[in-house]
Amino acid sequence: VHVGPCDQVCSRIDPEKDECCRAHGYRGHSSCYYGRMECY
């Protein structure tokens, strides 16, 4: 699922990506495609 507010952390370390996804109600991040954060 694309989570727009997390796009800005795509260049940061994985734990920060997971933290952003969790803050939006997801379990963690799966990947960043072209600057778009994908959470699951």
UniProtKB/Swiss-Prot annotation:
Induction (record text): By bacterial infection.
Protein family per UniProt: Belongs to the diapausin family.
GO cellular component: extracellular region
Keywords attached to this entry: Antibiotic, Antimicrobial, Disulfide bond, Fungicide, Immunity, Innate immunity, Secreted
Tissue-wise expression: Hemolymph.
Pfam families according to UniProt: Antimicrobial_6 (PF08036)
Function of the protein: Fungicide.
Name the record gives this protein: Spodomicin
Chief location category: secreted
